[in-house]
């Protein structure tokens, strides 16, 4: 038996939600370890769609414990709203199936406002990052700046006013510089006290809880929220998220040691998508890109934003295999490629007349690279709902094998529709 870390190997939206749900049936505990409510995922269970953005996927399955780790930034209002929405769908969330790390940072209204103000200012100067405006980045800034309000602070009303003063000293200075009204101390105090009773019952010393469960033999599934190429260090900086999204963060963001992580499963879409700004070497702005977007329903769960689409970039995924230590991949949305006469895979780039095998870290160089493609024959037959290799056309199998060879990692699972059971299992990541 081993634990499993699920990471996205591209820019997010790889189909992690379905795979995590599929794996959660084999897990006892599902842990979110980074990000906030800026990355959504959709689960389809018995014909019912559940759209989650903060809660771990395991929360919709009976008998599973969901954990929000210390690496997550928690908007308490978003947490309460998501719990209430699930209640309306018949899913009851209590401390018996959800724990929130007491040392997790809270997202406040002033974080959301600052996020939006910065994006608006950047839009006017052409330097927009393309955030979801949900306050994720500013909350992480306060965490690193050692002025954040954390979940545990909601239980200590004696020391909370001083902590609010500290965070407002910083934020009101920023607001004065931006020419907007300052936030009053009472506004933030009221905001925090209004959610305390709803949030505090879920708080726990998560590292201790997970350590006890690990020693007891529980199977733990770590759920990443965004793709590796959005990692603050290893992604396409500055067009990245504000946290580490690679597999190593599963340890830091949950309080478990790296030796407890086990199998690293990279969720990998059979083509490439990206939301928002930033480099995208294989982007297709033609009818094929439109075809992929429409057939793949490439619209953001959280924002509704249309995703940019392009050919599979093996060079980028190969980089993710290295930075995450990926053991195997779950290849998703192969069925979206059905019907295309030919398919292209990027195997490297040309940069200023030189051939390179990875995307450079420099923003300027990233904008200048040109993809080097190989071309494969497509297939006319449908792969939708395939549950064994025998159900796949020969050219589809050839495409999968080519992907494995180019990225240097085997396919452990192959997803052929949004339905959980439409999955070909090659290797069970939870097996010893």
From Swiss-Prot:
Disulfide bonds: none annotated. Its EC number is 6.3.4.4. Mg(2+) binds at residues 13, 40. One of its GO terms (biological process) is IMP metabolic process. Its main location: cytoplasm. SMART domains: Adenylsucc_synt. InterPro entries: Adenylosuccin_syn_GTP-bd, Adenylosuccin_syn_Lys_AS, Adenylosuccinate_synth_dom1, Adenylosuccinate_synth_dom2, Adenylosuccinate_synth_dom3, Adenylosuccinate_synthetase, P-loop_NTPase. One of its GO terms (molecular function) is magnesium ion binding. Belongs to the adenylosuccinate synthetase family. Homodimer. It catalyses: IMP + L-aspartate + GTP = N(6)-(1,2-dicarboxyethyl)-AMP + GDP + phosphate + 2 H(+). This is Adenylosuccinate synthetase. Binds 1 Mg(2+) ion per subunit. Pathway: Purine metabolism; AMP biosynthesis via de novo pathway; AMP from IMP: step 1/2. It is found in: Cytoplasm. Gene3D superfamilies: Adenylosuccinate Synthetase, subunit A, domain 1 (3.40.440.10), Adenylosuccinate Synthetase, subunit A, domain 2 (1.10.300.10), Adenylosuccinate Synthetase, subunit A, domain 3 (3.90.170.10). Substrate binds at residues 301-307. Its cofactor is Mg(2+). Transmembrane segments: none annotated. IMP binds at residues 13-16, 38-41, 132, 146, 226, 241, 305. The active site is at 13 (proton acceptor), 41 (proton donor). The keyword Cytoplasm applies. It comes from Rhizobium etli (strain CIAT 652).
């Amino acid at each position: 038996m081993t634990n499993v870390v699920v990471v996205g190997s591209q820019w997010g939206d790889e189909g992690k939600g379905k795979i995590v749900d599929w794996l959660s049936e084999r897990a006892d505990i599902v842990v979110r370890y980074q990000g906030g409510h800026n990355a959504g995922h959709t689960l389809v269970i018995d014909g019912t769609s559940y759209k989650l953005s903060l809660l771990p996927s395991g929360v919709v399955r009976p008998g599973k414990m969901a954990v929000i780790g210390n690496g997550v930034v928690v908007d308490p209002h978003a947490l309460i709203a998501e719990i209430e929405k699930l209640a309306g769908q018949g899913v009851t969330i209590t401390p018996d199936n959800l724990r929130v790390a007491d040392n997790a940072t809270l997202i406040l209204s002033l974080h959301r406002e600052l996020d939006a103000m910065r994006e608006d200012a950047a839009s006017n100067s052409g330097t927009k990052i393309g955030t979801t405006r949900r306050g994720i980045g500013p909350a992480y800034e306060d965490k690193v700046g050692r002025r954040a309000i954390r979940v545990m602070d909601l239980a200590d009303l004696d020391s909370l006013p001083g902590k609010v003063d500290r965070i407002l000293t910083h934020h009101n200075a920023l607001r004065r510089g931006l020419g907007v009204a300052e936030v009053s101390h009472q506004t933030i105090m009221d905001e925090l006290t209004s959610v305390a009773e709803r949030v505090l019952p879920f708080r726990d010393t998560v590292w201790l809880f997970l350590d006890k469960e690990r020693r007891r033999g529980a199977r733990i599934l770590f759920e990443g929220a965004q793709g590796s190429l959005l990692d603050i260090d290893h992604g396409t900086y500055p067009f990245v998220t504000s946290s580490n999204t690679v597999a190593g963060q599963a340890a830091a963001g949950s309080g478990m040691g790296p030796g407890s992580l086990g199998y690293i499963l990279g969720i990998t879409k059979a083509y490439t998508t990206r939301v928002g700004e930033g480099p995208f070497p294989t982007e297709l702005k033609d009818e094929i890109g439109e075809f992929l977007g429409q057939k793949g329903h490439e619209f953001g769960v959280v924002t509704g934003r249309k995703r940019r689409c392009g050919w599979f970039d093996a060079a980028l995924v190969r980089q993710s295999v290295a930075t995450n230590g990926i053991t195997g991949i779950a290849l998703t949305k192969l069925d979206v490629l059905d019907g295309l006469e030919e398919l292209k895979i990027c195997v490297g780039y040309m940069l200023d007349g030189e051939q390179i095998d990875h995307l450079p870290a420099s923003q300027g160089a990233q904008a200048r690279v040109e993809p080097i493609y190989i071309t494969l024959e497509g297939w006319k037959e449908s792969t939708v709902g395939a549950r064994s290799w025998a159900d796949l056309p020969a050219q589809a199998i050839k495409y999968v094998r080519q992907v494995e060879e180019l990225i240097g990692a085997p396919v452990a699972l192959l997803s052929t529709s949004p339905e959980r059971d439409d999955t070909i299992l090659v290797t069970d990541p939870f097996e010893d």
